[in-house]
Amino acid sequence: MIKAVVFDLGGVLSDSSPRYLYRKLLKSETEIDEFLSTVCTPAWNHQQDLGRSWQDATDELIEKFPDKKDLILAYWHRWEDTLNGPFHQSVDILMDLKRRGVLLYLLSNYSPENFPKALEVFPFLRLFDGRIVSGFVKLAKPDPAIYHLL
């Protein structure tokens, strides 16, 4: 019998990507690719997942790329536009497991500033019996240490 299940948020329970935001702000996929590979890179975003403040993160990039200021700030201020909604089949599984009495845990890389917003956007996050959110514990996947917190 399964006693507990661990879920991730992004890519498992929710569909999110900065591309959703930048498709509204840039003209082509090529521009988006260039921006996300040279300015707001995955490595830069990972630092927020580890707990760096969005203010510090955006200040750093604006200093390097002053001509991209509005696009950089959009990543922070328009975070909700990076979301494309929940994966309903995954949420259905989550809810079914909850009804069956299975313990549910969330282990996710997320900024401590954005996770409270995610709780508002995704009410199903309140179903978890426990949550480990990278930005709050200052560890992030794929670091094995975060898994030991389960």
Identify the role of each PLM range.
Residues 2-92, 99, 111-115:
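N-terminal helical cap/lid subdomain that shapes the substrate entry/recognition surface
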Residues 108:
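Conserved phosphate-coupling serine/threonine residues in phosphotransfer and NTP-handling enzymes
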Residues 93-96, 149-150:
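CheY-like receiver
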Residues 112-150:
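Substrate-recognition "cap/lid" segment bordering the active-site pocket of phosphatases
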Residues 98-104:
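Short, conserved structural micro-motifs that define repeat-unit consensus positions
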